[in-house]
Design a protein with these regions (language model features):
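Interfacial helix-loop-helix junctions of multi-pass membrane proteins
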Residues: 139, 178-201
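Hydrophobic transmembrane alpha-helices
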Residues: 152-157, 200-208
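Conserved small/polar residues in nucleotide/adenosyl-binding loops
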Residues: 210-216
């Protein structure tokens, strides 16, 4: 019994930093409120270039893979690279909070989704399911895009993947596919994607400047 107790204490001390993941409770509660309340009387998001981007249902796959991609990045850094975990959370949480504030103060949405599908397959069925669970509101900056960039930055800066070019390349490919998917399945306007890139650029520099470990601290903390 004593050994089990000591083991639990050791695990708690080693991974006590994961408490900051409780932010997701705040985020999901706030986002859920916005999804329920921002249904009409919102500002329409649209750029002319949106009309030239065709609907392609196959991109629903990388769009859904985003959930696993983000979960992997957070879990891996939490377990193996505490300093990178803190930097990643600082990046993600700031952008997600900015998104919530914008959506609250400036309710927004789009009408880019197709009214009907000219053909049906498993991918259009997935799109139909996605449309039924996610309203076309609360759009910018796109969290799908912003968080994908954050995870890729974490992979590129993690000491664990420094010499694993295949992992870095796979992360880049998936990140790009996810970003494209937001537009090809008509979940986001180019405006949402562009604003996500702008915010990511700012936060990338801020996180590196203020939360990077100093050389004498070492690159990794377990």
């Amino acid at each position: 019994m004593k050994k089990i107790q000591n083991k639990l204490i050791e695990l708690f001390n080693r991974y006590k930093h994961v408490w900051i993941l409780s932010y997701f409770i705040i985020y999901l509660t706030w986002f859920g409120y916005l999804e329920r309340t921002v249904t009409t009387h919102y500002h329409l998001i649209h750029l002319p270039i949106d009309d030239y981007i065709p609907f392609c249902e196959y991109f629903v796959i990388p769009y859904i893979m985003w959930f696993g991609y983000v979960a992997f990045g957070i879990a891996f850094t939490a377990l193996h690279d505490k300093k990178e975990f803190y930097r990643l959370c600082a990046f993600l949480y700031t952008g997600m909070t900015v998104f919530l504030v914008i959506s609250t103060l400036y309710p927004n949405g789009h009408n880019l989704r197709p009214y009907y599908f000219t053909h049906h397959n498993m991918f259009t069925a997935l799109c139909e399911w996605l449309y039924s669970t996610d309203t076309p509101t609360n759009l910018f900056p796109s969290i799908h895009v912003y968080n994908s960039l954050g995870i890729h930055f974490a992979v590129m800066h993690s000491s664990y993947f420094k010499d694993k070019k295949h992992v870095q390349h796979a992360s880049l490919v998936l990140c790009v596919l996810i970003i494209l998917s937001t537009m090809f399945i008509k979940q986001h306007s180019v405006f949402d994607v562009s604003t996500a890139f702008m915010l990511a650029f700012v936060m990338y520099n801020v996180c590196l400047l203020y939360t990077s470990p100093s050389p004498r601290d070492g690159a990794t903390s377990r």
